[in-house]
Amino acid sequence: AANNNSNNSNNSNSNGNDDDAINVWTDYAILPQACVTYNSNDVIVYSMYAQQSRHCTDSAIGTYAAAVPTFVNAYLDQLQNNANDSHVDFTYPEMAAYLDCTYRQVNGKDYYLQVGCADDGSQALAVNIYEDGQCTKASTWNGYDDANVPVDLSIEFRKCTPCVIWTDKNDDEIDDGYYDYKMTNAPLCRTSWEYRQSCDAKCQMLAREVKARDGWNQADQILLSILTLFGESITK
């Protein structure tokens, strides 16, 4: 894992090409591929497709990267949107508390936490530990920087997902603007498109590599004993 400082700039600077704006998302799909460290930043690599009916088997519009907090925030917005549409409750995971760089004190020492990539492979998220308030300088123990925070959110990597997810509705449940709203309000795809960054050959190669780091279990046990983030030693 690495820093997520690019998230701050991503939230204020989108791709910026109005000619590429997409207003109706009905035909599009997104395929999250991996969570990797690229150019010293933790990013989600994903491909976008213009014909969702082909289930991401055709040529992609492109393969891009977005800062992990940016992508995860959009992913959660999409889950909330889906839940609202199905009239079910949605509870945000504990990890959502660390979308921004968040201060914690452990055994009298200052740390900062933020969602990023896990150390044990490219298909998982983690809450990472940093030494500075911008979450740019990783704080490691035996080479690992994942904190002991419950990982209660998983991205469905390598799964083709339509940008617009329809649910069965009775005519009495919807008004005239429902379909227009659904077609234009696709939180995950809209945000991923707006804040997309270039993912070159090196970036795409990293996304194809799924390698677990040897010795993770031992390092994890050390972290569990050192960073008890929900123990009495924590001062918020």
Describe each region flagged by the PLM.
Residues A1-K236:
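Mature extracellular/luminal domains of secreted and GPI-anchored eukaryotic proteins, especially small
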